[in-house]
Structure formats: structure tokens, C-alpha cells
Amino acid sequence: MPNKLVNYATLDGIAVIELSSDAAGAPLTETNDRSPNTYTHEMMSDLDDAIIKARFDDDVSCIVLTGNGSSFFSAGASIQMLNSVTPGFKYNFCLHANETLSRLEQTSKLVVCAINGHAVGGGLEIAMAADIRIARKNSGKVGLPEINLGVLAGTGGTARLTRLIGKAKALEMMVTGELMSFEDAHAHNLINHIWEGDAADFRRDILDWCSQFTLPNKATKAVGNIKRSCQTGPEIPFEYHLALERELQASLFNSSDAKEGIAAYVEKRVANFTGQ
């Protein structure tokens, strides 16, 4: 096993970013299926680097974010780390984590979070910055229980959970510290899909499913523009969102892939997209 906090690999147009750490947020020194994958500033810096690496790789069309092992996607920030640093460090730690997750959220490539186990606290905050969340059945729960530590979910948790599931349920979930089953999370649109299978099957199925978003299967510029409209549009007035949508569409009409897609439809053949 690579002795890293964040493992990075690419396979057929997909970048796989894996969180991998012990309870203290240190790199794993041996195989551990129950690793909590807690994060420190060092792991968040490594995650930031991996996001930028995938963003600039023209051969990468889709990003898969997951955790090591079969028990946790991530248990969130290392409590041992938080207990040993100053309030000033904690503030900048949260600020940097916010910047990293915003970078993930704003990356034009589709980000799929493969929730292979519990995603709690900061672990759920990371998952919520992805575009699509898929969980492995019966492998864990999700929640933002920071209230039990006397704090709030300060890495985008209050902002993203409210936007994803609505104010009333998000507020209740955070002030009670409730941990939600994957089934309940799916019912509240926090999780897109729940798949059965062991950890190895789950990862294989995730990669197979994500292959549909790679070239030549999908027009990657169109995927990126759809994501940009969906991410940015809800934060601006509706008429501005419509204007943004028109401009994004206009740029696609001038792309080679739009010409290929329309021609393939007329000619009743499968389109061969190039990302141009």
C-alpha cells in the first residue's frame, strides 16, 4: 500500500482519488480495512494537489473520490489534531479546507463520490462537494454530529447540507447530531444511488458506471458546461442564470462535439466525441 494520505491514480480517463489515514490522520503503514481516513491540514493539502492534478490532465474526464478500506469513506477531521492546535490554526484549517472543497466543486470535470463506508462530520462535508454521491449498501451512515463537540460543521457543512436537503431537515439533523442511514439520505436526495456488493465489487462498479462520462462516450465540454450552469446558476438571479445558460449553450454550438453529436443523430449512428 502506498504510504500516502491521498492516493492518486488514473484509469481510462478516470482519476481516482483515495483518502487513506489512521485515526490521528497519519499515513497508513499497513493494510487496514477499517481505516477511518480522518484528515489533517496535510491530507487536505494533498487532496488539493490531487484535485488540481486531475483538473489539468486533459486525459481525465471524470473524478472518483473514495476512501481506503470498507468501513469508512471518512470520519472527518482528526480530533487528536484539533485538540492539539490553537484557535487560529483551526480557523485557517477550516478556511483552507473550504478553498479545497470549493475547488473540487468548481472543477469542470464531473466528480463522483463513492461512499464506501461511514461519511460523518468532515467526511460528509467532503462528499457533499462532489456532484454525484453513490453509497455501498449497509456499509455505514452519514451525518454532521459536530454539535456533540460543541461546534458546527465548519467546512461547508451548514451551507451545502441546507442547499441539498432543505433548511428544516438540515437544521434538525445538525442540532440533534443525527446519523442518517443511506436509505434515509437517499430519500432526502443527499445520496443519488445505493449499490449492493462488497468493497471490491463496489469500486469496480463505480468505475464501470463512470466510464460513460469519458471520451468518446460523452461530450466532455457539454458535461462541464452543464455542471457550471447547475453549480453557479442557483447562486445568481434567475434571469442571470438563463443568460449564463444561453452563453454556455452558444459556446457548445461552436464545438466540434456538438457538430458530431447532431450529425450522429441525423445519420442514426453512435457519436464519437473527442472533447473538442
Q: PLM ranges: what are they?
A:
Residues R103-K218:
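Crotonase-fold acyl-CoA enzyme core
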Residues H41-F56, I79-N116, A159:
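An acidic, glycine-rich surface segment that forms the CoA-thioester-binding/catalytic face
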